[in-house]
């Protein structure tokens, strides 16, 4: 019987510079998913690579005093070496400067032109060089790029355009009938409400103002727009041929099962890419997942901000698997995660050194101390053993359920419950006490056998996330690798096996002070220019009549997520938000248009008064209130919880306004 196929891709990394840990996270995440699918028995093809054309790269190469090709060769090599360092098990590393890719892109452009989907015209508007994106004046936010926030420059040039509107209705229908296509759901709502439903404009797909790109073969003064070039890597990398001579690999693997990308480029992958595929008469990918960002304490990592942490530096301090564990475990499903050196040390000590490393070391050491390393199941059981076994055997299904939904961080948490339960089992059975009683030797042997078996099961599940650690643990236990199917049974470790007599420390505890001293030597802190602090203004709040606690307790506060938002027509102050609270979605109208764009609101966690009587604002029903605060200058900001502990909040401490006050009506 042939294995089911699974084709997973990352967004190809842009070759503008050395990748930081935020860029690297995506490759590690894709690798964990690919490894788990292989464990499940899938025939996996995992593709990653580098995006190497565009005006930004041409300018960077000029600054460096090298040719564009020399520049991308160097950076692509850096990216590949980092992916290899992080133990990513990709099957194909594609470069958009590969000759076969470039030829197919030219053919694809020509085919779309011949079909009438591409036509020649003149482009006039705004262009963001870092994002390689075109915008109209109305799409800019305060005159800047809506994606990255950098300044845009006017652009006017002859160009080819793609008729996006031709396929818009078909794409909308596809998204409606395939709810799994764009994930998480908040990203889908953003694409539908902000781009597709308002109507698509034709897309500029060529440039003449720079040369570093793939020439349009029938009009060589034009180069192909970088996103048309880059997106097609997903098909050219597995052997797509525009003339119909597709490779066996393409016929087997397409459509892709998962495009894993950053949330900042989801528009290109869920609007442009599927429309390009429709033009080529190819099936659409099954799912596009826009993962959140890994932030460095004070925001998104950026070389210009000077807050970058690099993967190879982290590996030098902590090791590959510790870094893999951190980035996979600390990234929520749909919220940004945070990485700092201090957090890395904390996780290293508490979870890797204590929970996992100490468990393995203690178990092996006790096996050597009491039985010369021989691990035997003597069958002397107690009720606590049954509890341990049933708990451990319940975990694989939980991990599988989490991985099916791409909740990788939650899956790792489930795996570590096995190691925590084994540590608890040591406290419950007290092997050191059993060792003092000659009559309890068989019971002691059984306890140690159960520990070794539990570690083997947990370690097998750990293999997708920390592959080297898995090999090291199994090697020390003298245990063979298992399949996920094997994990349905407790007791497969061969009784009488002998563990190593020289246990190695898997993860050493680290001193935060020493680590930070070395980090500061590596990256000396920048001296911030001293600024005179403006005199703080004390805001006089108009006294309101006192209320009793019982009055306050009547209010119900819940945390929700804004999944869609739009400006209220004919209102200068109102935004209408769709807020997901638990399993329900509420419509809430707020007078915050002067402070937030609809795009900024989408994805925000907000606090909502949910038992407020529904009211109409500007003729639109509002089913609650989003809580806000106001500073001395009258600026309003949404109250956003740092994290969600639970949906219902018993109390809160903030200043609130009536709907009519904040709406200004």
Predicted regions and their residues:
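Beta-strand segments within the central parallel beta-sheet cores of soluble alpha/beta enzyme folds
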Residues: 287-290, 474-476, 576
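Intrinsic disorder at enzyme termini
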Residues: 473-551
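Phosphate-backbone binding interfaces of nucleic-acid-interacting proteins
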Residues: 530-665
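Structured secondary-structure scaffolds
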Residues: 2-48, 100-104, 148, 154-369, ...
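N-terminal catalytic cores of NTP/NDP-binding nucleotidyl/phosphoryl-transfer enzymes
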Residues: 2-75, 94-109, 114, 131, ...
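A glycine-rich helix N-cap at a beta->alpha junction
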Residues: 76-91
């Amino acid at each position: 019987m042939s294995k089911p196929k699974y084709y997973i891709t990352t967004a190809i990394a842009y070759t503008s510079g050395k990748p930081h840990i935020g860029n690297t996270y995506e490759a590690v995440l894709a690798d964990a998913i690919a490894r788990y699918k292989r464990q499940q028995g899938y025939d996996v093809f995992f593709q990653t690579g580098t995006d190497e054309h565009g005006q930004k790269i041409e300018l960077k190469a000029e600054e460096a005093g090298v040719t564009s090709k020399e520049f991308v060769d160097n950076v692509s090599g850096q990216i590949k070496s980092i992916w290899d360092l992080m133990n990513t098990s990709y099957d194909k590393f594609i470069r958009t400067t590969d000759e076969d890719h470039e030829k197919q892109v030219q053919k694809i452009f020509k085919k779309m032109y011949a079909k009438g989907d591409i036509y020649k015209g003149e482009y006039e508007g705004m262009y963001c060089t870092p994002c390689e994106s075109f915008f109209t004046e109305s799409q800019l936010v305060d005159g800047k790029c809506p994606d990255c926030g950098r300044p845009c420059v006017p652009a006017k040039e002859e160009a080819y355009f793609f008729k996006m509107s031709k396929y818009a209705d078909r794409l909308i229908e596809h998204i409606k009938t395939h709810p799994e296509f764009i994930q998480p759901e908040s990203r889908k709502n953003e694409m539908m409400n902000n781009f597709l439903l308002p109507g698509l404009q034709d897309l500029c797909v060529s440039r003449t103002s720079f040369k570093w790109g793939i020439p349009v073969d029938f009009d060589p003064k034009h180069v192909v727009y970088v996103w048309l070039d880059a997106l097609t890597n997903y098909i050219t990398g597995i052997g797509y041929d525009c003339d119909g001579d597709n490779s066996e690999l393409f016929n087997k693997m397409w459509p892709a099962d998962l495009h894993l990308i950053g949330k900042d480029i989801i528009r290109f992958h869920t609007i442009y890419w599927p429309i390009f595929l429709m033009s080529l008469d190819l099936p659409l990918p099954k799912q596009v997942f826009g993962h959140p960002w890994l932030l460095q304490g004070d925001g998104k990592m950026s070389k210009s901000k000077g807050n970058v942490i690099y993967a190879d530096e982290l590996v030098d301090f902590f090791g590959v698997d510790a870094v893999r564990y951190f980035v996979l475990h600390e990234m929520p499903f749909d919220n940004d995660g945070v990485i700092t050196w201090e957090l890395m040390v904390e996780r290293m000590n508490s979870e890797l050194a204590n929970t996992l490393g100490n468990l393995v070391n203690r178990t092996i050491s006790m096996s050597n101390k009491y039985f010369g390393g021989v691990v035997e199941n003597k069958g002397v059981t107690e009720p606590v053993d049954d509890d341990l076994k049933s708990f451990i055997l319940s975990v694989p299904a939980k991990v599988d359920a989490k991985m099916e939904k791409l909740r990788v961080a939650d899956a790792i948490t489930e795996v570590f419950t096995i190691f925590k339960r084994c540590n608890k089992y040591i406290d419950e059975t007290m092997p050191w006490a059993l060792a003092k009683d000659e009559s309890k030797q068989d019971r002691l042997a059984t306890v140690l056998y159960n520990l070794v078996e539990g570690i083997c099961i947990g370690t097998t599940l750990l293999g997708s996330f920390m592959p080297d650690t898995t090999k090291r643990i199994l090697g020390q236990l003298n245990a063979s690798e298992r399949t996920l199917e094997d994990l349905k049974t407790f007791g497969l470790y061969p009784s009488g096996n002998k563990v190593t007599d020289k246990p190695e420390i898997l993860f050493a505890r680290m001193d935060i002070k020493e680590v930070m001293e070395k980090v500061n030597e590596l990256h000396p802190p920048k001296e911030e220019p001293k600024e005179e602090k403006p005199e703080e203004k004390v805001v006089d709040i108009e006294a309101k009549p006192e209320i009793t606690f019982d009055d306050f307790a009547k209010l119900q506060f819940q945390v929700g997520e804004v999944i869609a938002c739009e400006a209220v027509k004919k209102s200068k102050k109102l935004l209408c938000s769709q807020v997901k609270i638990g399993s329900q979605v509420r419509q809430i109208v707020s007078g915050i248009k002067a402070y937030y764009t609809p795009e900024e609101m989408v994805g925000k966690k907000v606090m909502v008064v949910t038992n407020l009587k529904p009211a109409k604002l500007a003729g639109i029903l509002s089913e609650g209130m989003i809580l806000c605060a106001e500073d001395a200058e009258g600026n309003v900001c949404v109250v956003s919880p740092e994290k969600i502990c639970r949906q219902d909040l018993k109390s809160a401490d903030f200043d609130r306004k009536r709907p009519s006050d904040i709406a200004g009506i």
